[in-house]
Amino acid sequence: MKKALLALNSIKKSGVIDDYAIGGAIAASFYIEAINTEDVDVFLFMSASENSILLSLRPIYDALEQLGGRVEKEYIVIGDWPIQILPAYSPLVEEAIIQAVTVQYGNIETRIFTAEHLCAIALDTGRMKDFYRVASFIEQGKVDRLVLNQLVIRYKLEDRTKNVLNWSSDEN
């Protein structure tokens, strides 16, 4: 993972991307017991190119290939780690990128989503493994329930908390 983080920091420093934040299982592993995963989910802001309304990952992939990455399916593999580049696809993810926290991975600085944003995005995604992850955060006391509750209400995720976690967003 070290090579992947160094490459991401390099393309940030060179201006290919403005910033990034890691989400998914890798980010969750900074808070709760390690979770098996095969890739690194990297979220960032993107805008369409001048001549197109479509978003293109090509400039990012080109820059990462110059740093030793190779494209495989929807990933760019750096070292042994498949990196999935994901545009900020919702206001919740945009907020998660903006409010991401800086952490150390060994001697490398990187940014990850807050525990509360990871949980809110997991609730929004709605897969069983995501609900399990939210329950793990809560059971291990790694999430501020008040902050999570505010996200749940702001992004209208109350039905997810009631149906899956037996937790009403009215609870603090």
Report residues per predicted region.
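Compositionally biased terminal segments of proteins
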Residues: 1-172
